[in-house]
Amino acid sequence: MLGSKSIIAVVAIASAIVTGVVVIVVVVTLSVVLTRSSVKDTNSIYVPDVITNDPQMTNEMDTLEVISSSKFSGTKPKEWTMKYTKYPYWRCGLTFTNEEKQNIVNENKEYMNSLLQLINNGSLGRMPEKYGGDKQFEANGVNWEADRLEVRYGLFGRVFGQRAVAWAFPGEIVTIKFPKGMSYKGIQVGIGKCNHNPSDQWLNVNNWSNDRMPIDSIGFDLGLNTTQPYIINDTFKIGSPFGGMIYLRSDTTFTNSFYVTFSNVGRAPIINYNITTNEEWNSVLRNAPGNVAEIRTPGNRLVLTSRNIRSLEDAQYISDFWLKAISISNYAVTLENIPITLNFDQRVDAGAAVAYVGRWFTQNPSDWAAACVGKDGLINYGNWGPLHEMNHHMQGTYLKGGNWGISNPGEETNNVMTSINYILYTNIAGHRNQGLSGWNYVSDGYSTIYKILKGENDQPHLRSYVNMAHAFGTDTLIALVKSYYGLWYENNFESKYSIKRDSTSAFCLLAALVTKRDTRYLCSLFKYDIQSNVSEAIKNMNYPTYYPFFNLYAMSYNGNYYGRPYKIPYGRTRLNFTATTAIDPKATSVSYTIKSGLTKGKLERVEDNVYDYTPFFGIEENDTFVLNIDCVVNGEKVHIEQEGTFELDPHQVEYEVYKDVQTRDMAQALNIIQNKTANDTGRASFFGIGTYNDGSMQSMLVEKGKLIVPKSGYYTLFMKADDLGRLLLNITGEYEQLLDVKTYLGGYSKTLNGSYATVKLEKDVGYPFILYNLNTGGQGFIRIGYCYHGTEESSVDVSKCSVSDIGSSMVLNEKVKTGAKEPEFQIPPIKYSRPTRFLTNAYRTIPKCLNGDDACSIKCLSLPLKHDDSSKCSNMFDDNYSTMYHSRWTGQGTTFPVNYTFEFSENVTFNNLYVHHRRPEDSWGYFEMFVKSPETGEMELLEKYKHPKSTTTELNFQKLVTTDRVQFIVYNNSNGGNYVNVVELSFNIKETFKNYTNSFGPKIKSTGFKKVTTPGASGGYLAVNEKEGEGSLCFKAKVTKFGLYGYRKTTSGKFRVTIDSQPGEVTSQSYFSDSERTLFYAHTFDETEANKVHNICMEVVEGTVNLDIIGSS
């Protein structure tokens, strides 16, 4: 190596290096979630206070700042004069003939198509309230009293598509101010709910909705000739008789950020990933006046009506969930610079929902929206529909070969991606003791394979893929997905084996290569045909056979942890390992051995592989076990080790069954059972007792537990029963009879005395109850339902109740101690991070020459003869792409080879060379590069390069080079011409990093720096020193190298980096590229200092400096 590694400082250059994109994969364990202390990350050693990778960090978000606020004037816009006497609006309850519908469509269309003209001449009006003008967008009204705002919206240009900005009040005009003189090509402004284009809205009366006006949204392309007359002094005005969300759309024309000001708007419930905090959400945005809402992450956006999001409290969880969801597909399949839009609208023109893959949006029913923002539901039940539609966009359409999968690739792809989400980020498998229905089977190993081993042909294709995740991990499943693009084409398998990419043979082959297992037995279970040459190839790999056998109680497979703890009830439970293991029915010599564990309870053997287990631990504890499964399959011994964790299920209540109670009177039945012993027991996971059939015998069932409510206030409890029922509830310290149903009641009644009662209950208090059900023969049941009225007694109105069954979350086992809390589900961290993107990973280490040759510190010791006096040495270093050094081309032109020799006033260090030519045909051809050795003073050959005909030349060197003299011997023009030219020549440091940390991260000590709102910056903020020449940012790092990234500014200050109290040189903050975020400093530690803990500070010396992120490896 020439020279030595050192602290490298920074100066600036022009733009033209390709932005480096580093794909970050953060592999995390689920040890907290799995409650397995033995599961550890062996790839890292935790050092307190040392910066680490921030997997949540992204740099693709826009920003919004409120500039000013004013009170409502008190005067609403004038009402639009409408032609007819009734119109559709939210829950209007009206009916319309086809003629009425068509008339309204025509009027609606005419008015919306005239919006810009109406705004321009001052004739815009609002839809009258008496016709439902305040009740569009699924709203019960408009908050007219809300403040009117002026906001500054920062659009991050590298990401295109539509974004929600703010709320427009019905009939009011919003003024939009764009940057002076900007081009409007590629800019659109929309207003309404979801689709800005009327062609995306159903205007056929056969698809009429009584809940809304036919056209409630419209958009305007500002680049069109028909729109541009309405742009005056860079100002555009928009409004609608219905109001709506204001949207700003950009296309790929824009690469840098710009700011747009919106006046006379209201806030809307908009959640921006990694920007919107729970504090801001709950104090400002949650109840903002906008009746349309948006959740936005770098990879997707959900547009829904605000009524679905008002009850949300944890906004950060919701945006985090949706980023995690899209990031799985982004990592496994494809990544685009436009978020996928999930619209929740009433207009769905195919099936339950539809994905417009080519247009990058999905249309979902509006009644799917609430579940997308329900935290408990997403954790415990998932949300298959919207995830499925979203992942349709990840079918591989944009990658080599298109879709992958067996038989039906388009569906298989998105279902596999959704399954990974269920496995990683939900607690669905934690409820498998209650059984898993629908798509939820994908979350658990046993549930995924059980039906296949039973011989059922239920979704075998998806099960065969998902099974890999449970046995080998989601990394392996994603590797299998990637193999359809990588291994498949790299090895030309289609030609080699004469098989198709969507065949079962292809699956078996790729699965074997990825898992390093013999998959022939697995494929036989799924009844997959394997072509003979493929089968022979798998056999010759000599991998061990994979046997997909899983126990229901377990949550690991031979060391891979995939599941969740298994819930068992209070009291004794029977563990039947034979009945709860999915295993080949033809297997022989089957044995189940509890190798270790189950020490926190009483374990009693009943028979082979069957035990009674009585837990001694409480709700906040657990017990663990290791289970060995041994058997013989096809003459081969099979050994599988699975681990599991038992937790108590506090939401299972117990009931006793007293048989032969010969009375139809509840009072007599209670007397009869006083001195009797229960004949049987049962359990329920809700408030009530499910279907119980006692045949011709009468029976009395008694359930005891505790009622717990999520909110304090007034509740009306309802009972339905077959046949008789009674509820005692302890509110004041004594049981009191609350409900008494004396006859069969198949549904909840709001009028039958004794079947309902209203009580005031406090949140998180366990109210003991006793529930009696007298079944007079045959099939019986009893259920308790509820209606919540709020905290004021005056709001109680039973007639308006919408009664819901009381489910498991509102009942507790009577043995749950007062104050004991169920362990909260620990939300797993993101495993597949979205890459930190749009970085320029280089900066220039030579000075600029802005004032001609005489003032240039770089000396040209040798150059080819120049064409004319406009060709100056300094032109190659002036960061100006309109100047150059052009060799002679007239006469006989330039005689090759030619010599370029440059001398620097001091040593420069670089690992990257960048040369820019005017045109491809002007470029260097074959050349050799020499540098002067600092040790010997001799010129030494560094590189030989045959440059193809192109505008740019970029060379990367494996090690840092330090020298004060560089020479290029150019032997020809790449196009055979008799000249060459150089527009810009730069020597740079270029680095990429594995980890990235926000400049305002918790382990960064900031002194004298403030947050400056900046689109595209991490978290929406840039760290900028408050006072010129003052401020520092310090951190600890255990790395081999690190780098500092900031935003390019026309003027910048100076700083020094101090490492372990050793100050570096004072340098200027300037950049290589015109890209917004670029590297401006890097340091590589030598071998003796690498991976030691170092104290690092960036200290401002002069002017203003900014920092966005810190990269490290």
UniProtKB/Swiss-Prot annotation:
Entry-listed glycosylation sites: 121, 207, 225, 233, 274, 533, 576, 622, 675, 679, 730, 753, 880, 899, 907, 972, 995
Segments forming a coiled coil: none
Record localization: Membrane
Sequence ranges assigned to domain Peptidase M60 in this UniProt record: 159-473
GO molecular function, one term: transmembrane transporter binding
Topology of the protein relative to the lipid bilayer: Single-pass membrane protein
PA14 domain span: 648-800
Keyword Glycoprotein: yes
Spans traversing the lipid bilayer: 7-27
Protein name: Antigenic protein P1
UniProt source species: Entamoeba histolytica (strain ATCC 30459 / HM-1:IMSS / ABRM)
